[in-house]
């Protein structure tokens, strides 16, 4: 595995590759990341993994500062996976002329997390666009854990006629049901138990929600009783259009954002 921080050096190694896969990350690797990387390796001739904590996508400075990262630990976790290139750029490598404030993304940005995190998805689309322009991968691998983000990037790539294929990968969960996430390291043991109970509550009531045997407000009240003080939203939506499903099918998900102390 070659570890590269300069984009020009990376380009020298990869510019001839025709079947290049790319996994963008912000580090703090867990089994979810490793699953993305393994899938990329299995489908592509060469694999590039990046670690870059994208400052512009954070709405609060303190969230950026406390984001967990340990490069040495991350390298150890993937060194035996047959990754070809690990790209570790700094802020100037990615934003030599500053951020693009005029980037246009789909109306999906106004829903769910976009309503509460202004500019977040524009910043995500901007950095993904910059990475694609540098690496020019045939495929880019993103997790379905961040479903709204995945749909926005899919739409952005299609709208801008970018040749890279976006591959959505299944969510990997811990034994307690929680999706593997770098943010989980910020939770206490008791908070993880609450998060696990919420996941199980949603799974148990998913069919009842779509059939309207139980309301979202009833679920919201149950979650509040578990000790959650703030819920930004809870919705059941078609996963492709992010609208309320108009017919009974399996093409929907429950979307929720809530806080456990200061962790969202």
Language model features: what each stretch is:
Residues 256-260:
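Short beta-strand elements
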Residues 1-230, 237, 241-252, 262-264:
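Nucleotidyltransferase catalytic core that binds NTPs
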